[in-house]
Amino acid sequence: MEVAVLGLGEAGSRIAADLAAAGCTVRGWDPARRPTGIANADDPQSAVRGADVVLSINAAAVALDAAREVATALENETLYADLNTASPQLKRELADALPVEFADVALTGVVPSTGLATQALASGAGAERFAGLFRPLGMPVDVVGTRPGDAAGLKLLRSVFMKGLAAAALESLAAAKAAGVEDRVHADIASVIGEELLERLLSGSHAHAARRVDEMRAAAAYLEELGIEPRVAAAAAELLEELSAT
């Protein structure tokens, strides 16, 4: 299988490397990175030309421009999968902008750690095809709907809880430190949710604060679209923005 990977940051480069290790022919494109172990194209059109599957793993802010940039270079049978954390509306816009089958894919794990084995949700016209291609390569794919945006929406709703929980832990422990009881409060929280989860919430928030600001803003916008006031999502975005500036 020939796979083009657009975006070779932490997530994209790890997935590209895993695909190459699994026997796929991988061509990558990133204007700022050229990792070893895969073929690096000179431009995005060269990366996608002739590919069976295109994986867009750049960023929600550039996903639509990236799709439009390569649209005319795609083969009729190419499957275009967008793996960025984005709003359901953006996923629908991507599907409309592309002349090929589209899959909305939402990754719900820590990609730099688990790579191709990261749990994925998929929706859209190309979801079943995506699952059929990537499950044999080790990716656990759960097809959740036929509409682009269904997978993205589920991830964002999950993120309201997970990132909201992380924000609550960060705020609680910051206050506990100011009060001189950080160790006690840390132990109390860990006794409820487990030390492993607590450490993952704290370390992940610090390491990925900037990216998660965009995620929580997208979640807040989605809640508003659903008629729900995004109190927790908005507060989590604000806290993460402060954290990203430190």
Language-model regions: role of each:
Residues M1-G50:
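NAD(P)+-binding Rossmann beta1-loop-alpha1 motif at the extreme N-terminus of oxidoreductases
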Residues V3, V26-R27, F102, V141, ...:
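Hydrophobic anchor at the start of a short beta-strand
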Residues L6, W29, S56-I57, V105:
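The conserved SAM/SAH-binding core of class I Rossmann-like methyltransferase domains
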Residues G23, I38, A51, E77, ...:
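Short, well-ordered alpha-helix to beta-strand connector turns
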Residues P44-E101:
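Rossmann-fold NAD(P) dinucleotide-binding segment
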Residues A63, A86-V160:
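Rossmann-fold dinucleotide-binding core
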Residues L154-T246:
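Helical "substrate-binding/catalytic lid" subdomain
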